């Protein structure tokens, strides 16, 4: 299936929706401006998640869900994902034969039943939105650029390549994986910026200079933002020290087995690597790999390539995250836009709280915003 729908997820395909994503970013800035004007502490981490959900809605379905506009957890999706994710992580890591046992046996456990129902609520949304898209004329669908329309066009153009259930599953996965991964990354970026004021100052200076010399314009284009060296270094380093997806990514040893670092693995052995471990490898990232230091990404092109090759935040090889272009577009567009307009500070001196449930969920990212005088 991945090969069939792959063209819908290319960077070129994603950026056809950049104008619509700009509207989500601008609405988000208006909401953040309200918090700045009120001078009130607010849950910045939750709002970053709401932005991520609306970004997914816009690019995948053609319009935002309404999280930002209505200032609510639209449809209870955030609560549903957070409730379902611990169960999903257990099911995903369990052997195939054990998965139905966990799901069906869990119905008798209130917490697990609640998680199953929460996940099913998102599935029903995916089905409903797909049915609406199917009701459009074929000609109308072919002119649209959202990913759902692109996938439905592929289904029509290549009979037998996809079932409608395949489309439902694809959209269900997009809502869950596309939102939590990006919001987790954004929370990490801003958390580490706030914890390292010198890094924040340097990045803001780069953004201001880019606007002054015209290399950044409004709205910020993804093609412009990725050329900012220090912005890229900050995002890369944040993803390195705190990857939003941190579980072993299982693979099976091939026929005949193989040897890795002096250890023989027989055929069929299940093995995996965790980004949270790999991305702290001192041989690749340096003796100070435990530290948040974006400057390591600026030391040389060769070192950048070596470190980037070792990053597992979006997976690797044929199993690279298919939605990574959307996630990166949201990050590279919204981070400089926020820092151009606002000074962001933690509202307390407490550390954030984290919980790993496949996606690492962070909380207690409570902030205050102040409009910048030169905004």
Curated annotation (Swiss-Prot):
Hey, which pathway is this one from? Mycotoxin biosynthesis
State what the entry records as the consequence of deleting this gene: Abolishes the production of ACR-toxin and impairs the pathogenicity. Does not affect growth rate of cultures, sporulation, and spore germination.
Q: Which UniProt keywords apply?
A: Heme, Iron, Metal-binding, Monooxygenase, Oxidoreductase, Virulence
Q: Which enzyme type, at the first EC level?
A: oxidoreductase
Q: Say if the entry is tagged with keyword Heme.
A: yes
Record's Pfam families?
Answer: p450 (PF00067)
Query: Which residues bind heme per the record?
Result: 321
Q: What is its EC number?
A: 1.-.-.-
Entry cofactors: heme
**GO molecular function terms here?**
heme binding; iron ion binding; monooxygenase activity; oxidoreductase activity, acting on paired donors, with incorporation or reduction of molecular oxygen
Q: What does this protein do?
A: Cytochrome P450 monooxygenase; part of the gene cluster that mediates the biosynthesis of the host-selective toxins (HSTs) ACR-toxins responsible for brown spot of rough lemon disease by the rough lemon pathotype. ACR-toxins cause uncoupling of mitochondrial oxidative-phosphorylation similar to that of classic protonophore. The structure of the major form of ACR-toxin (ACR-toxin I) consists of an alpha-dihydropyrone ring in a 19-carbon polyalcohol, a typical polyketide structure.
Its family remark reads: Belongs to the cytochrome P450 family.
The record's misc note reads: Gene clusters encoding host-selective toxins (HSTs) are localized on conditionally dispensable chromosomes (CDCs), also called supernumerary chromosomes, where they are present in multiple copies. The CDCs are not essential for saprophytic growth but controls host-selective pathogenicity. Although conventional disruption of ACRTS1 could not be accomplished due to the high number of the copies identified in the genome, the high sequence identity among these copies of ACRTS1 is likely an advantage for RNA silencing, because it allows knockdown of all copies of this gene simultaneously.
The protein depicted here goes by the name Cytochrome P450 monooxygenase ACRTS1
Gene name, Swiss-Prot/TrEMBL: ACRTS1
